[in-house]
Amino acid sequence: EQALKNENFNVRGVYDLNEIRGAEISKKYNVDYFSDINQLLNKCNAVSIVTPASTHYEIALKALENNCHTFIEKPFCTNIKHAHEIQKTAEEKNLLVQIGHIEQFNPVFKKFISFNPKPVFLESERLAPFNKRGIDVDVILDLMIHDIDLILSLVPTKIKNISANGVQILSNSYDLVNARLEFQNNVTANLTASRLSIQPMRKLRVFESNVYSSLDLNNLSMARYTVNQNSKNHNENVVFELDDKSVSRKTVSVNAINALYEELDSFSQSIINRKPIIVDAKKGIQTLEIAFEIQKKLNEN
């Protein structure tokens, strides 16, 4: 739908294993349906893969072999070997691969990184109602992967230690996971993801030496709390005071945008103008490696 709204794309059609579903999409958006993926790939120079995670590798490799720039919805792949093979094939053919970590295009996060933050501690919470559609992978690859990606972009340092706990409740994989990442520069991140929540929540809290930022990625709002050294100069926004220090609160305004449109537009700009890809295959692999390490820690427990 968002690709149809973008003048950089000429949507040639859609492929779906389910012919009934494919016909419905074809009718709804007035695009051609292809029951043979090769016929569609022969008409394209770029593809968007929004299929179950277990199929990403096979479809992406086929697209690259047909000389198509490739957008792959998260998670990149279900194992590292496949992700590396996709990266290698794309590089050999001089093709672009973008991974669908959509929160990079969330206007709240984009606004936040404009402050050039220097985190010392981060905490993420990503809660969602149960959805059968995502249970081919655990909650780490389904939900937490977004926050791993965001945190790695905020703390571009190697991780020295990972610990994790999780539970399986409805599905055959982990539905609730908490992970702790300790970086070599002594920054720590605490991540929680659950797909068993009544209400959705996507929050990121970032603590710096003198600033605390609370990002609501779901409701597109942000508040920043700043430590002031002279409490006598406070204003009505002060929320705490102690001796000569105070903490003031400021709400940061954010303009709502369609993150999915922005994500696909960025993909098109990278193809047309060779604009750097925000989440390329290399970054996608780095995020996957941490996700799989969290899985490993859970299995050890």
What are these model-predicted stretches?
Residues 46-49, 95, 184, 266-301:
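C-terminal helix-rich "cap/oligomerization" subdomain common to oxidoreductases
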